[in-house]
Amino acid sequence: MTVPNVLAKALYDNVAESPDELSFRKGDIMTVLERDTQGLDGWWLCSLHGRQGIVPGNRLKILVGMYDKKPVGPGPGPPATPPQPQPSLPQGVHAPVPPASQYSPMLPTAYQPQSDNVYLVPTPSKTQQGLYQAPGPNPQFQSPPAKQTSTFSKQTPHHSFPSPATDLYQVPPGPGSPAQDIYQVPPSAGIGHDIYQVPPSLDTRGWEGTKPPAKVVVPTRVGQGYVYEAAQTEQDEYDTPRHLLAPGPQDIYDVPPVRGLLPNQYGQEVYDTPPMAVKGPNGRDPLLDVYDVPPSVEKGLLSSSHHSVYDVPPSVSKDVPDGPLLREETYDVPPAFAKPKPFDPTRHPLILAAPPPDSPAAEDVYDVPPPAPDLYDVPPGLRRPGPGTLYDVPRERVLPPEVADGSVVDDGVYAVPPPAEREAPTDGKRLSASSTGSTRSSQSASSLEVVVPGREPLELEVAVESLARLQQGVSTTVAHLLDLVGSASGPGGWRGTSEPQEPPAQDLKAAVAAVHGAVHELLEFARGAVSNATHTSDRTLHAKLSRQLQKMEDVYQTLVVHGQVLDSGRGSPGFTPEDLDRLVACSRAVPEDAKQLASFLHGNASLLFRRTKAPGPGPEGSSSLHPNPTDKASSIQSRPLPSPPKFTSQDSPDGQYENSEGGWMEDYDYVHLQGKEEFEKTQKELLERGNIMRQGKGQLELQQLKQFERLEQEVSRPIDHDLANWTPAQPLVPGRTGGLGPSDRQLLLFYLEQCEANLTTLTDAVDAFFTAVATNQPPKIFVAHSKFVILSAHKLVFIGDTLSRQAKAADVRSQVTHYSNLLCDLLRGIVATTKAAALQYPSPSAAQDMVDRVKELGHSTQQFRRVLGQLAAA
């Protein structure tokens, strides 16, 4: 009896790469003469248009039940290998099957004409059967599988096909094998749904690379480290056609609901899909009718078989009497006639604080323009904003009494801020706890020109030059002192010789006095800046600068104390070389402290010092404190129009935030890892790209604000580097022979305590950062939290740099330097990825990259701490 050959359909185009291979196009029907011909796994011998050749089997689909009426012989192709008997195995057991017996010409069976996507189930006739496990259809990927090299040698299959155990295609073996000629029906064919003709997927990731995540995956904290949960990274919720899925909690995104569902089935659709505007007892809850995206239509008179009508707008008018299934399908009803409806904060996760329930302004949140008087280009008047203003329209300030009474008439409303705002203290805190605090507002330009009683503020350019000169003076004098005294580990130091000789007394005294003088001059400059900070628009700048100044004051007092001990003790019996060592150890940290103070002043120079005015045609004395209105108006026209005035703490609860659109990026860009010139260049490029963030500034909850303030205090706490007053928790025990010296061990133990204390702060900052990202906070929030992470980790970099300079052992210096450089590189990466995540918000891939960098930083800081502990115990 002649066995007809099975037909196969081409799923992809194929270009022949050898003379023995067939070329075909997608959709061609060809006759399969032999599978795995001559032992070539995956290569089938086929006939197409009268020509025979081998083709890659993974680019074909067997047409079940369809055979070639005119059987085609093997022809000139390679001869088929005779089939071999297959050992008896129970059903469901996978065993290697010889290729010739695994795929053989199919026996004729009775069948009815069916569609191309239905498998036939012939009547079983044998007791054993050979099993071949193949993947089920998955419409997730569209790239054709790679074909194997067209050689005639035995090869291993190019891909392995993992699939669930239920998707088994039972291919009948050869005629000589005691097997069953049967196909098992796949699970999807029995439910009557369409089967997609898509090649099998190799894994949850395709040939084109990793699919970008649809949601940012935040690691969870385990002990002191952070790990990703494996279950979260494998959730592919969008790769199955929706009509094949039952309604469930996964239907939460951008697809309108299906008609005919009950009201309680809409609870999970909480994002971008508005509910249907249905009135009457059978309609949906009116509390859910919020936004302006057209939902699907729900008609009670239609059958439930109709699905997902998209193009009928929702109802806007709510002033008609309620009736059964009454719809208002119109857009032209003014919002003022709409019925007020309560605001449900659970429907909007980005709006953390809802307005009061009795407020009538909660009705039309986004699609109603603000009142006409709220314009940006009109100076504010005496009108106070009403409760219905829900936009970021600047509130009007209360004018000073003399303006309200009409005694002073002045068109320059932006030139000088009212005294009430410039002098009155406020309890409001700004959200950003940056190292710069540079805020651009309508008051910043004018507050620079306010003269402090008794002293004239320096011009901006002169102040910056003086600051650089003072910082350089501190570094130069300290370097001269260290060169004179010499490091304890240096070969040329005064203690490195066999007979230690102290440096000359006069030279040492002059070097110490020079250090004192340089630090004192820098402190005087900083004190003047602190005085200027009381008159800036940033209410927190004075407190931040005062903390930086106090840190430098403590360093200066320590230098003075050690210098006095050195002067009074030299030549006396009580003087020891350790006194000089303490002075040297204290002096080593002075340049770094001066650099931090100078960096802070440099970043806020535009707020602390007076801008250089452009020369005018009038006399030099025209720039007095109280110019006439004409001069003031001309000065306003000569500079750019300032941004709208800020909210006051009494006007709005979000008074903690800056009103400048680019203020958060300006605060964030300068974190002591980037120069001011580079910052100004990149800042201009960023702001020219357009709107970095247009959404309103959300209001933090009380708990988040408390956490933010606590982190700000912890991050601003300076590192204790006074080794002279430190006593170890346990007495120092001598290490093993050939280990660290006592000075290195004491140094490591001292900074190990500092490292552990700062690791706690860093862990808290990372937790708060991950919480902000997981709750989808805007860039204003997560950028501020990332600054806490960066500043906390920067303290560990400072500890590593200090240890690498002061340690004597080469092994300690090399390991500490390695981890310090690693942390510094990670911080640069976090700065770059955070900028990208803020600019591309709400891109999940950019945010995920930022989260991964912070997670890597957490692991590296734990390794740094362990290395310090191991070195101290050596």
Curated annotation (Swiss-Prot):
Domain SH3: 3-65
Short motif SH3-binding, span: 639-647
Keyword field: Acetylation, Cell adhesion, Cell junction, Cell projection, Cytoplasm, Phosphoprotein, SH3 domain, SH3-binding
Main location as per UniProt: other
Origin: domain of life: Eukaryota
Tissues expressing the protein: Expressed in olfactory sensory neurons (at protein level). Expressed abundantly in the liver, lung, brain, and at lower levels in the heart (at protein level).
UniProt GO BP: actin filament organization; antigen receptor-mediated signaling pathway; B cell receptor signaling pathway; cell adhesion; cell chemotaxis; cell migration; cellular response to hepatocyte growth factor stimulus; endothelin receptor signaling pathway
Feature: compositional bias, Pro residues: 73-88
Biased composition (Low complexity): 374-388, 431-448
Phosphotyrosine: modified positions: Y132, Y238, Y253, Y366, Y376, Y414
GO CC annotation terms, alphabetical: actin cytoskeleton; axon; cytoplasm; cytosol; focal adhesion; lamellipodium; membrane; plasma membrane
Region (Divergent helix-loop-helix motif): 750-800
GO molecular function (one): protein kinase binding
Subcellular location as annotated: Cell junction, Focal adhesion; Cytoplasm; Cell projection, Axon
Residues recorded with modification Phosphoserine: S143, S296, S432, S441, S643
PTM-bearing positions, type N-acetylmethionine: M1
Assembly and oligomerization: Forms complexes in vivo with PTK2/FAK1, adapter protein CRKL and LYN kinase. Can heterodimerize with NEDD9. Component of a complex comprised of SH2D3C, BCAR1/CAS, and CRK. Within the complex, interacts with SH2D3C (via C-terminus), and CRK. Part of a complex comprised of PTPRA, BCAR1, BCAR3 (via SH2 domain) and SRC; the formation of the complex is dependent on integrin mediated-tyrosine phosphorylation of PTPRA. Interacts with BCAR3 (via Ras-GEF domain); the interaction regulates adhesion-dependent serine phosphorylation. Interacts with SMAD2 and SMAD3. Interacts with NPHP1.
Role: Docking protein which plays a central coordinating role for tyrosine kinase-based signaling related to cell adhesion. Implicated in induction of cell migration and cell branching. Involved in the BCAR3-mediated inhibition of TGFB signaling.
Domain notes: Contains a central domain (substrate domain) containing multiple potential SH2-binding sites and a C-terminal domain containing a divergent helix-loop-helix (HLH) motif. The SH2-binding sites putatively bind CRK, NCK and ABL SH2 domains. The HLH motif is absolutely required for the induction of pseudohyphal growth in yeast and mediates heterodimerization with NEDD9.
Protein name: Breast cancer anti-estrogen resistance protein 1
The species this protein was found in: Mus musculus (Mouse)
Encoding gene per record: Bcar1
